[in-house]
Amino acid sequence: MIFQRTVKEMVKTTGVGLHSGNKVTLTIKPAPVNTGIVLVRTDLTPSVAIAAKADQVRETTMCTALVNDEGVRISTIEHLFAALAGLGIDNATIEVDAPEIPIMDGSASPWVFLLQSVGIQEQSAAKKYLRIKRPVRVEDGDKWAELRPFKGFRVDFAIDFNHPEIARSQQHMVMDFSSSAFVRDISRARTFGFMRDIEYLRANNLALGGSMENAVVLDEYRVLNPDGLRYEDEFVKHKILDAFGDLYVAGHAIVGEFRAFKTGHALNNQLVRALLAEQDAWELVSFEKEEEVPVSFAVPAGAVLA
């Protein structure tokens, strides 16, 4: 049987909030089976917990943000959630003393390192997967995203940026997900932005924590970061990273194929909501025998299982 997983012990880190520019402290704690991922704002009195569910995503401008019915928000969850999804962590309590998750280096790599450093604990209950039974698709103009039946988890993703540096890179990628492939090929891809947009955002008191330390920055013609790119196709890989995090608010790892063109946080969330609303399009499954498990969901790379 494949079991649910949590972190083996508590781990804490600090970083900078992308929009506020302020120091943020974040703590990840083990959680019991069937808890899911729960975020807690510890800077409020009393503290406020928000379950990571698709219907709690109420802001998708430049990031994915959870917002409860009282308007309490936790922004920029997607890179941390990509790491949780990539390492197969089902249950965790995440405490944060600010309205946003720290941006770290703009990728999921610091979160992967943090989670692997404390290890992953197998738990006593069967892991549940969300298996796609029939296609579900959402569209917005020429942008679209869909989930289709597939034995495993495959991503077929394309972007289309009219920028000379991005146009020179590969803007389409197909990958069969595995934890090791995520860590090696996707997790280090950083968020990217254009200098003209950053200047506008800062003028409006946004992106105050953004810098070349946590993003790939481009002008009209080239990448401005002195060290260049981490992957030749870092742009499309980061969009895939974002999608991994955005899809994880479905509450379970997905068994299916995710196909998308020019999608972002908003359309990713619309897809998850559309899927969950069409209950005949999916089912929750567990795998009793090791040989039944799609190769995508083997034990995570670097996991310390007890």
Swiss-Prot record:
UniProt keyword annotations, A-Z? Hydrolase, Lipid A biosynthesis, Lipid biosynthesis, Lipid metabolism, Metal-binding, Zinc
What is its cofactor? Zn(2+)
Instruction: Tell me which GO cellular component terms the UniProt record holds.
Output: membrane
**Pfam families in the cross-refs:** LpxC (PF03331)
Provide the residue positions that the database annotates as binding Zn(2+).
Answer: 79, 238, 242
**Where, by residue number, is the active site?**
265
Q: Which InterPro entries match?
A: Ribosomal_Su5_D2-typ_SF, UDP-acyl_GlcNac_deAcase, UDP-acyl_GlcNac_deAcase_C, UDP-acyl_N-AcGlcN_deAcase_N
Q: What class of enzyme is it?
A: hydrolase
List the GO biological process terms. Answer: lipid A biosynthetic process
Catalytic reaction equation(s): a UDP-3-O-[(3R)-3-hydroxyacyl]-N-acetyl-alpha-D-glucosamine + H2O = a UDP-3-O-[(3R)-3-hydroxyacyl]-alpha-D-glucosamine + acetate
Gene3D superfamilies xrefs? lpxc deacetylase, domain 1, lpxc deacetylase, domain 2
- GO molecular function terms noted in the UniProt entry: metal ion binding; UDP-3-O-acyl-N-acetylglucosamine deacetylase activity
- Give the enzyme's EC designation: 3.5.1.108
- Pathway as given in its UniProt record: Glycolipid biosynthesis; lipid IV(A) biosynthesis; lipid IV(A) from (3R)-3-hydroxytetradecanoyl-[acyl-carrier-protein] and UDP-N-acetyl-alpha-D-glucosamine: step 2/6
What does the protein in this record do?
Catalyzes the hydrolysis of UDP-3-O-myristoyl-N-acetylglucosamine to form UDP-3-O-myristoylglucosamine and acetate, the committed step in lipid A biosynthesis.
Q: Which family does it belong to?
A: Belongs to the LpxC family.
**Do you know which HAMAP family this protein is assigned to?**
LpxC
| Protein name per its UniProtKB record | UDP-3-O-acyl-N-acetylglucosamine deacetylase
Organism listed in the record: Shewanella loihica (strain ATCC BAA-1088 / PV-4)
